[in-house]
């Protein structure tokens, strides 16, 4: 059971944090997105929730689990993208490692997302990747990207060594311009965004109309076949190792 990895005190703290986000969205008439662990049955998910004026309006379970830090041993992967209409625009929601997989942000683009929100726990050692990937996703999908990263230190689940987290929250517009960044401390990063810039960029550079799904369909099928073959080979080797 995944739940043996976590204690009751942790889930109580998570519940308090979620209540705080809900209250914050109500008190300030805001849309708030935050991520934490979620228990359902015998499974634990890394889940982002979207609150609007004190109401939970959407949730997203992280699809891409971070295997280098053995996240897949402690959490179950989600299987449903999240795109939701809010008072501030149509949001696509990702979590941390998801940003490395362009297929998911592109799905949000297909579904008309205007803003991509990415809560993360991205370490200082790879902070350049965080900054570059957020900006790339904004440019290639012609939308705003809001990345929120943690600060402080925490031990790696895999090695036990402490990792530092730089904060480095940022707001990026559809042209790739960085509108605001954090300073490394816990706090708020703010910027005024104009959604008409999304429509303008998509008119000037009509990526949607120039897509070639007829080509991608076959390419994705080949990728799927290779991944399936690799998984079968890995399972076969594991079974052989167990017998020997």
Predicted regions and their residues:
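Short, conserved active-site loops that position catalytic residues or coordinate cofactors/metal ions
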Residues: 1-10
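CN hydrolase (nitrilase-like) catalytic-core segments centered on the catalytic cysteine
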Residues: 14-33, 99-189
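C-terminal beta-strand edge segments of enzyme domains
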Residues: 150-244
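Active-site/binding-pocket entry motifs
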Residues: 38, 65-66, 152, 197
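Conserved beta-strand positions that form and line the central face of beta-propeller blades
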Residues: 9, 59, 181
């Amino acid at each position: 059971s995944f739940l043996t990895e976590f204690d009751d005190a942790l889930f109580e703290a998570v519940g308090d944090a979620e209540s705080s986000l809900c209250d914050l969205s109500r008190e300030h008439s805001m849309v708030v997105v935050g991520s934490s662990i979620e228990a359902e049955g015998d499974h634990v998910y890394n889940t982002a929730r979207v609150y609007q004026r004190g109401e939970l309006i959407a949730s997203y379970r992280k699809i891409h689990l971070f295997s280098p830090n053995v996240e897949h041993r402690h959490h179950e992967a989600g299987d449903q993208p999240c795109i939701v209409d809010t008072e501030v625009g149509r949001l696509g929601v990702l979590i941390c490692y998801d940003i490395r997989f362009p297929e998911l942000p592109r799905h949000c683009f297909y579904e008309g997302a205007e803003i991509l929100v990415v809560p993360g726990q991205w370490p200082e050692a790879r902070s350049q990747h965080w900054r570059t990937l957020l900006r790339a996703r904004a440019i290639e999908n012609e939308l705003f990207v809001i990345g929120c990263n943690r600060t402080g230190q925490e031990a790696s689940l895999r090695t036990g060594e402490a990792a530092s987290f730089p904060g480095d929250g940022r707001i990026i517009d559809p042209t790739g311009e960085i509108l605001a960044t954090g300073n490394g401390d816990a706090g708020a990063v703010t910027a005024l965004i104009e959604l008409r810039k999304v429509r303008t960029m998509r008119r000037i550079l009509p990526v949607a109309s120039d897509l070639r799904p007829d080509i991608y369909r076959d390419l994705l099928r080949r990728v799927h076949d290779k991944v399936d073959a690799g998984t079968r080979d890995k399972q076969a080797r594991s079974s052989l190792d167990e017998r020997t």
